[in-house]
Amino acid sequence: RIAATADPEAAERARVVLVEQADRVAPELGDNPRSLIEDALVQSGVEVRLRETVERVEADNIVLGSGERIASCTLIVTVGPRASPLNEAFGVALDPSGRAPCDDMLRVIGVPDTYMAGDVAMAHVDDEHVALMSCQHAITMGKFAGFNAARDLLGLALRPYRQIRYVTCLDLGRGGAVFTTGWDREVQMHGDEAKQLKRTIVSERIIPPTGEREAILAAAALDG
């Protein structure tokens, strides 16, 4: 990315350090794709500090819990998503990410006549797993919430939200990408092939149609 926005020489001079408080890289993604992620970090020249935390941020460096001082002009902090604080207005117990609990129909539990979808909603995708705060689940949740809200107004039967299929497609920079399936994230594809799939996903598949009415309605189909 530095090479694309500046020049290759600047990219080669840049020092990138990943600080992770866990004892391994990308702990939330499990063991299956980890070797590919680690290889991509090495390929990109990223230094890794495991079991570490940032204790202090100063004008031109950061100080780690171990006392190591890293000279820096840019600090990027990734600490996980947080739901909109508007959820607090519902007066219900929220999950650690600030999401409101929903039943299988995506109705907010304890709040009558209220449907919810996306990052603000905590709902099960199957009998074991809860939806993640990602477009993969938010898009389908939106379809079900809209479907059920409309049918509720008409006094028609509702349909439980279920989204059994789960995939992960992670961009790895120079290392291409890795595509996995299932909650155990079995690797199905990696490298340039997975990179092309990632580009297709972000540029086509998650973009809703804006043209013909028929295309818009087709995209909203629950089984589409």
Predicted regions and their residues:
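A conserved short coil-to-beta-strand element within the FAD-binding core of flavoproteins
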Residues: 50-61
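C-terminal auxiliary extensions adjacent to catalytic cores
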Residues: 174-224
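FAD-site-proximal beta/loop scaffold in flavoenzymes
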Residues: 61-62, 69-140, 147
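Rossmann-like dinucleotide-binding cores of NAD(P)H-dependent redox enzymes
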Residues: 1-52
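Internal hydrophobic alpha-helix adjacent to the cofactor/substrate pocket in enzyme cavities
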Residues: 136-163
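SDR active-site lid
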Residues: 129, 156-164, 182-189
